[in-house]
């Protein structure tokens, strides 16, 4: 006869060894899953940062390409603080740089197509420019928007405008949909819907940490673009009061410019521009990299800024945060060697002389992307 006691006596429980083995297997499975999840998350973060860095560099280059290519559009004299189409500002004109370069240039701002909320900046009818009659635009809102783009006023100071890229003049009065320009001896008639462009002196500048003026909105270093309000140490500066500069690309660490010029070497074609980039004294025969000038103030004839015909732009962007790697460590070396960008060796100073060791995050812990492009100034061709 089978009793309840016999049944209980015939049952065997889990031994301590079996329990420990089961716990160990479970721990291994959980640890493996955690490792896969952690490494996947870190790999995804690294990939996202890399993509963001590449996008920032491309955006910065696209802005510069458009403005440099159009530099000098409709220009027949100084515009704002730009005395020439291109105003170079090398970090150190006497030797290797210890920080990013800057550039200022004359660029057109226009709105030839228009929208319902931003009417086109075009002539409302056939107009005799310089006859003493005002220029009638498509609407008063177009004049208001143009004044806003100019900093709030078209007359204080007098804004420079280009009508169809053919006639450049200044605004002496603005009211309603009308602009008044100076009278000239021989007025020129322009057709209805001819676009009107506002010419501005635009500055490109990198704002390093800690960004006391807040231009980078917490994402310094960044590249800013706009009308600088004043001059610091002899160059236009977007951090001065009254500046109208905004960030166009985050985490841009360096920007370097080198220029090709025509008519800037007295020994080449007697210093007369001939449509060919001058061969610099230390370069080989023909056009090569040595014909791009990096260290110069462009203020002593014949090497002056009005002779610039090509600009070689190099932009360096960096990741915002350091990668963690696949373990739990927060530090790894991904940039083992300091970059040499044109005449700027980063180990001598990234933003200023001697700051290489104090850059945050550490220089060696962040990836960088470098992009170089050569741009022709099409409005300065001969």
Predicted features along the sequence, with ranges:
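Aliphatic-rich helix starts adjacent to a transmembrane/signal segment
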Residues: 2-65, 69-73, 369, 381-382
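Amphipathic, heptad-repeat alpha-helices with coiled-coil/zipper character that mediate oligomerization
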Residues: 28, 318-319
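N-terminal pilin/flagellin-like segments and related low-complexity appendage regions
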Residues: 57-314, 320-367, 376, 381-382
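A beta-hairpin/wing motif
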Residues: 372-374
């Amino acid at each position: 006869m089978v009793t309840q006691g016999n049944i209980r006596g015939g049952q065997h429980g889990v031994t301590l060894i079996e329990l420990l083995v089961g716990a160990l297997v479970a721990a291994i499975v959980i640890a493996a899953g955690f490792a896969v999840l952690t490494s996947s998350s870190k790999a995804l973060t690294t990939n996202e940062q890399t993509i963001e860095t590449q996008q920032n560099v491309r955006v910065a280059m696209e802005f510069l390409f458009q403005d440099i290519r159009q530099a000098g559009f409709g220009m027949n004299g100084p515009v704002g603080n730009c005395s020439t189409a291109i105003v170079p500002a090398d970090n150190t004109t006497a030797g290797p740089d210890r920080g990013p370069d800057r550039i200022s240039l004359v660029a057109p701002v226009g709105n030839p197509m228009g929208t319902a909320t931003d009417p086109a900046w075009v002539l409302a009818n056939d107009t005799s420019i310089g006859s003493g009659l005002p220029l009638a635009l498509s609407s008063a809102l177009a004049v208001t928007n143009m004044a806003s783009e100019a900093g709030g006023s078209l007359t204080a100071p007098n804004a420079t405008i280009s009508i169809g890229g053919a006639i450049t003049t200044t605004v002496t009065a603005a009211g309603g949909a009308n602009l008044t320009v100076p009278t000239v001896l021989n007025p020129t008639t322009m057709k209805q819907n001819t676009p009107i462009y506002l010419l501005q002196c635009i500055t490109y500048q990198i704002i390093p940490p800690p960004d006391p003026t807040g231009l980078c909105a917490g994402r310094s270093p960044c590249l800013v673009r706009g009308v600088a309000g004043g001059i610091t140490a002899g160059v236009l500066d977007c951090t001065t009061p009254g500046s109208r500069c905004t960030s166009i690309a985050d985490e841009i660490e360096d920007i370097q410019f080198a220029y090709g010029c025509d008519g800037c070497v007295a020994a080449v074609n007697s210093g007369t521009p001939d449509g060919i980039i001058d061969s610099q004294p230390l370069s080989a025969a023909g056009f090569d990299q040595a014909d791009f000038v990096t260290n110069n103030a462009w203020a002593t004839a014949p090497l002056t800024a009005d002779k610039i015909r090509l600009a070689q732009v190099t932009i360096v962007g960096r990741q915002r945060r350091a990668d963690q790697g696949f373990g739990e460590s927060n530090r790894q070396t991904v940039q083992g060697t300091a970059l040499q960008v044109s005449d700027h060796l980063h180990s001598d100073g990234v933003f200023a002389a001697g700051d290489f060791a104090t850059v945050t995050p550490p220089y060696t812990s962040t990836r960088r992307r470098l992009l170089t492009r050569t741009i022709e100034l099409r409005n300065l061709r001969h």
